[in-house]
């Protein structure tokens, strides 16, 4: 039986940390930035962790489970 392939879309969007948590980037930072405040754009720049409710689905797409 062949190996399971990782979902390409998930591979591009998520990174694994050293402790096993999953990092992601914020949405809403690609265009129409003129109406968004500097504070909001700066906050959207930083990456964050995937929520616990979504962690299992992301791990399944990355074939970590």
Swiss-Prot record:
A Pfam family per the record: Ribosomal_L35p
Question: Which organism encodes this protein?
Answer: Christiangramia forsetii (strain DSM 17595 / CGMCC 1.15422 / KT0803) (Gramella forsetii)
GO CC terms of this entry: cytosolic large ribosomal subunit
* Signal peptide (UniProt feature, chain positions): none
Q: Name one GO biological process term.
A: translation
Q: What does the UniProt keyword field contain?
A: Ribonucleoprotein, Ribosomal protein
Descriptive protein name:
Large ribosomal subunit protein bL35
Task: State whether keyword Cell membrane applies.
Answer: no
């Amino acid at each position: 039986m062949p190996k399971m392939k990782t979902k390409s879309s998930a591979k591009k969007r998520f990174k694994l940390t050293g402790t096993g948590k999953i990092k992601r980037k914020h949405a809403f930072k690609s265009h129409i930035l003129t109406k968004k405040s500097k504070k909001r754009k700066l906050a959207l720049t930083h990456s964050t962790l995937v929520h616990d409710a979504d962690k299992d689905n992301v791990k399944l797409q990355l074939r970590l489970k």
